[in-house]
Amino acid sequence: MIIDLHTHSNASDGTDSPSQLIANAIDAGIDILALTDHDTIAGWQEAEAALVSHPKGASLKLVLGSEISCQDRDGTSIHMLGLLFDPNFEPLMQEMEKTRENRLTRMERIVARLNESGIEITMAEVYSQKRDDATLGRPHLADALVARGHIANRDEAFATYLHNGSKFYINHYSPSPIDAIRLIKAAGGVSIIAHPLASRSGRKVEPEIFTELIEAGLDGIEVNHRDNAEDEKSLLLEIARQHNLVVTGSSDYHGTGKMNRLAEFTTSPEEWERLESRARERRVISK
């Protein structure tokens, strides 16, 4: 059984539409797929409709969720995957909306910094790289820089201008990971910290933070991810085992926006069963 619990569509910063993502997952032989766009559930309805209408849709089960942007006390970026939560739980929906709104003002400030350094780009060009209801993010700015000819591709844009240590980087409002976990749990869902050490992408949290996250109700750790180095995977696996947390592996697929391939890392059926059992209700979508 092939289980991929972390993917993105163009409802945030992926390049596949939710329908295309479903079709690609079916073609890839995936059995269980989670759609986890950044701070939004905008792609849920289309993904579910695509699954039901696809002639081979019975081969795939769909897990709906979101990757929620968070920051710890030191401003370190932490991403929390929320799965199987109730989309009608207003406190969680309001928090994600607040984060999305703040992304707009943040993007305006990043664009201004680029312009001040002689890198010409406009907000209109950034907006042209996303669909109307998509969550605005740095990948859209990266695509605009590529289209303008400033850079060759998304990866180069992040390596040169948009990484967290860049002089152009600006934090945006987002909840603490503890608050995000509590909201996900209150909405009946399960929470997984995404690529938590991720030294290969420049994002790294201190292992000590796990104590607070576990106390808040953390359900799992995304251990197997291309941005976690091998020694980091070993450390994360040890933490998960010590605290009886679910171990997941995921692609973090973004379509053509990143090198990540669907199901390049996966979650075992046994760990998925443990994770799903922690949700308040069964919310997996099937044809």
Predicted regions and their residues:
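A short acidic, helix-capping loop that chelates divalent metal ions and anchors anionic groups
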Residues: P91, K258-M259
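Extended substrate/RNA-proximal surfaces in nucleic-acid metabolism proteins
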Residues: A50-T211, T266-S286
